[in-house]
Regions:
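Hydrophobic, aromatic-rich membrane-embedded alpha-helical segments
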Residues: 63-93
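Membrane-embedded alpha-helical segments of transport systems
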Residues: 70-78, 101-126, 270-286
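Predominantly cytoplasmic-facing regulatory/coupling regions of multi-pass membrane proteins
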Residues: 1-69, 127-241, 267-270, 275-312
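Short helix-loop-helix connector
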Residues: 53-54, 93-95, 220-221, 259-263
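Transmembrane alpha-helix interface/packing and boundary motifs in multi-pass membrane proteins
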Residues: 71-79, 231-252
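Re-entrant/interfacial helical elements at transmembrane boundaries that shape
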Residues: 82-94, 245-260
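Membrane-interface alpha-helices at helix entry/exit sites of multi-pass transporters
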Residues: 61-66, 84, 96-111, 263-274
């Protein structure tokens, strides 16, 4: 049995290697163009949100694009989307008078539409059976539930008492922080401007993400249709929910399952690995280049060190 298993593994590896060799570079170039466009569109949408928060000063699209690209690059290697901290730190450093709560709130504005689109696509994919269904958790007994309710109730009472004790001294500071948070979402007060300068760019960015998946499916010789490309994007988005660098491992499992009706396991695995490695390489190259420009150095290592020093 072990001999057969070893042969099966070798056959799968050979099949995967063969797909890499047979890549259609024309579609790879198209995928690269879509990826660059996606990064540019999303960074410009973020710039417009920040510009609305700070109308008295001009926010450079290049500054925001550099910080955004650096954050995306780090997300591929840091767990739990650690690149977001770098993005905020670089924006705080390059935008005089800006504050962390305002910049964080500006980033949240972008997640509103992303969450709506992403959750809709995920729900549709699960409803069609394209994604695995998680098992239902066991129902606790009434006695155990009552014990937990008592514990939770005690904790809530303690928290309320503690909050009442420290709330007054912290109230003034909390109001100041909340004012800065509201400042970050200032563009939402002008729905027309929000739709024109943010939503349209985000929708175009989502189209580019689907274009990346579609082009890479074609490059690997797999069935390339819009529904399958959307499924690939959904699997990639779900993989980021697991706190591993770039969703590594999780993305491969989800894509192998999602593509089981249209591709062999070896083909789906080689496609998933190739797509993740390729996108990570592109994002990393762009991110390092952006940091070199922001810190005005020709040495990539020096740029990375400067970016690390800028992180909170």
């Amino acid at each position: 049995v072990s001999g057969l298993s070893a042969n099966a593994v070798l056959d799968s590896l050979e099949a995967a290697a063969g797909r890499f060799v047979a890549l259609d570079l024309r579609f790879v170039v198209v995928a690269l163009a879509f990826q660059l466009a996606n990064l540019a569109l999303r960074s410009f949408a973020l710039r417009n949100v920040i510009q609305a928060a700070y109308p008295e000063r001009r926010i450079s699209p290049v500054t925001v694009a550099g910080a955004y690209a650096a954050g995306v690059a780090l997300n591929a290697f840091a767990p739990a989307r650690g690149g977001e901290a770098l993005k905020i730190a670089l924006l705080r450093l390059r935008i005089p008078g800006s504050s962390v709560p305002t910049l964080l709130s500006a980033g949240v504005v972008l997640t509103l539409l992303d969450a709506l689109i992403g959750s809709s696509l995920i729900a549709t994919a699960w409803g069609l059976g394209a994604l695995p269904v998680l098992p239902s958790p066991p129902v606790p007994s009434l006695g155990l539930l009552a014990e937990h309710l008592l514990v939770v109730g005690g904790i809530v009472v303690a928290l309320v008492a503690l909050t009442a004790t420290v709330a007054r001294p912290l109230a003034r500071r909390a109001r100041g922080i909340w004012a800065r948070v509201e400042q970050g979402g200032a563009i939402l007060r002008t729905p027309t401007r929000y739709l024109r300068s943010v939503v349209t760019l985000q929708l175009a960015g989502w189209t580019c993400r689907i274009g990346v998946a579609f082009s890479l499916l074609a490059a690997f010789g797999l069935p390339a249709t819009v529904p399958i490309a959307v499924l690939v994007v959904v699997a990639g988005g779900l993989s980021t929910l697991v706190p591993t660098p770039g969703g590594a491992g999780t993305q491969q499992v989800l894509l192998v399952y999602a593509l089981q009706q249209t591709a062999t396991t070896a083909a789906a695995l080689s496609f998933s690995v190739g797509m993740q490695v390729g996108i990570t390489a592109v994002n990393t190259l762009i991110g390092i280049t952006a940091m070199m420009l922001m810190f005005r150095t020709l040495r990539p290592v020096a740029a990375v060190r400067a970016a690390r020093a800028a992180r909170p």
